[in-house]
Amino acid sequence: KKECNLNSMRILFYCDTVFSFGGVQRVLAEIAKALSGKHEVTILTTDTCTDLSMYGYAESTVRFDSFSYSASSFIERLLCKGYSFLYKHGLPHTRQTSEWYAASFFPSSYKRTLARKINARQCDVVIGVHAFMALHLSAVKSRIRTKTVGWLHNSYEAFFEKETPYLPGLDCFFQVQMGKLDERVVLSHADAGCFFRKMNLCCEVIYNPLTVLPKGRGKKEYRRILAVGRFSFGHKGFDILIKAFSVFVKTHPDWTLEIVGEGPEEALYRSLINEY
C-alpha cells in the first residue's frame, strides 16, 4: 500500500453521470470543489457530456477524465448473463457463488479497462460514487495500487428491503464485495448501524452538505409548491405527488406545483400532468 500525504493528496472520484440534474451529482460537485482547494481532485467518469458551467466546475480546479467501456465479446456476454441468471434464480447465495457472480456482474474486459485508468492516475485514494461504482472498485481491488472507498448514497432499506429495491436479492453479493474495500461511507448513523448489524460492515458517517443555501423563508402567500429530484422508477414518488396535487388544487385553484429534475420517468410524469 502506498502512503498518503494527508496535507496534499491525489483524490480520484469514479462516477457515471456528472453533468446531469440529480442529488448525487450536486453533492459530488460540492465536495469535489471543496477538496480541490487543498488537494488534486479528478473525476473519472463515463459521462459523454462535459458541461463545466454546471455546478460551478468552471470556477474550480477539479479535473475530468472521461472514458467508455468497449463492448465485450459475445462469448463473455453470454457467460455473464448465464451465470447472473443462475445466481439470481437458483444457486444458493454463499460467499463462493457471490464471488463468481462478481465476475459476471462486472466482466473481465471492463475490469482491465477500469484498472488501467485508475492506475494511470497514480492517485492516493479512489472513491466510488454510489453503490454500483463502489462495486466496480471492489471488483478491481486486486488490480489497482490505491486505497478504495465506497460512498453509499442510499440506505440499507433502499438497497434491499423497499418494495422496489435497488439491489433485490443481492445482499450476500453486496456484503462480500463491499467488505473488500478499504473504507465505506454512509450518510447517517442509522445506516451505519444497519449495515453493521445485518452485514458486519463497518462504515464511516459523513453527512451530505447543504448544496443550496436558503434565503429567507417560504410563505403560504406564494401559493407555490416546488419538488426537486431525479425521475427514477419506484423511489421518488413524483407520480403520487402529481395525483395528490390534482386533488389539492380542486379546492386551492390558485396554487401551482413545479417539479424539477430529469430521468427515465419524465415521459410518465408529463402524461400524468396532462391527465390530471
Task: Map each language-model feature to its residues.
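A conserved nucleotide-sugar
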Residues: 39-40, 238, 242-276
